[in-house]
């Protein structure tokens, strides 16, 4: 298991929440900078895959500051719920959503990817961008994603892999 801080006695989940609480004020800038903007491009492409699928309800897991949820509005769902374990990230996300006047469509709440606080078959689509690497138990997180997805619904995961070749390996 990869943990943010190897010398701590806290669980990976607690370490991840603490790390994101700490970096939340700079997260959007750092994410776009360190990914070379690829995060923005991938989110746009991913949401295009969900066009014309009749999606009315969406869940954005590890929503952070809400970038993927905001991008998902392009397919006109009635409701998007974003969950994250970091109160700091949620606070910045709420602020961003309020400034954009989107609080009627996007709702953010604290939530654990492995114990999602929703009934089975609740959402037409469940999305996560650059968050599964932070799941404490990947199998539990993915299983819970599928649990809350309606039959015939969609699960969409965006994630980076570890680069294996020069020069990206050295930069990563």
For each feature predicted by the language model, list its residue ranges.
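A short glycine-rich, Lys/Arg-flanked "PGG" loop and its adjoining helix->strand segment in the class I
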Residues: 139-151
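A short acidic, Gly/Pro-enriched loop at the edge of an enzyme's catalytic core
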Residues: 114-125
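Hydrophobic beta-strand segment of the Class I
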Residues: 27, 126-127
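N-terminal auxiliary segments of SAM/dcSAM-dependent transferases
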Residues: 1-17
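Class I SAM-dependent methyltransferase SAM/SAH-binding core
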Residues: 57-115
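Conserved class I S-adenosyl-L-methionine
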Residues: 154-172
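Short catalytic micro-motifs in class I SAM-dependent methyltransferases
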Residues: 130-131
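Conserved alpha-helix/loop element of class I SAM-dependent methyltransferases that forms part
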Residues: 26, 36-56, 71
């Amino acid at each position: 298991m990869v943990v943010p801080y190897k010398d701590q006695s806290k669980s990976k989940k607690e370490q991840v929440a603490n790390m994101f609480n700490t970096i939340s004020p700079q997260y959007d800038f750092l994410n776009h900078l360190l990914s070379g903007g690829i995060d923005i491009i991938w989110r746009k492409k991913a949401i295009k895959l969900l066009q014309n699928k009749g999606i009315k309800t969406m869940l954005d897991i590890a929503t952070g500051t809400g970038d993927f949820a905001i991008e998902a509005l392009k397919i006109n769902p009635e409701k998007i719920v974003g969950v994250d374990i970091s109160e700091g990230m949620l606070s910045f996300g709420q602020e961003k959503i309020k400034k954009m006047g989107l609080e009627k469509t996007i709702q953010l709440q604290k939530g654990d990817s492995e114990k999602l606080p929703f009934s089975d078959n609740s959402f037409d689509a469940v999305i996560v961008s650059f968050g599964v690497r932070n799941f404490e138990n990947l199998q539990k997180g993915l299983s819970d994603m599928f649990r809350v997805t309606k039959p015939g619904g969609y699960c969409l995961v965006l994630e980076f892999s570890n680069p294996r070749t020069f020069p990206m390996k050295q930069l990563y």
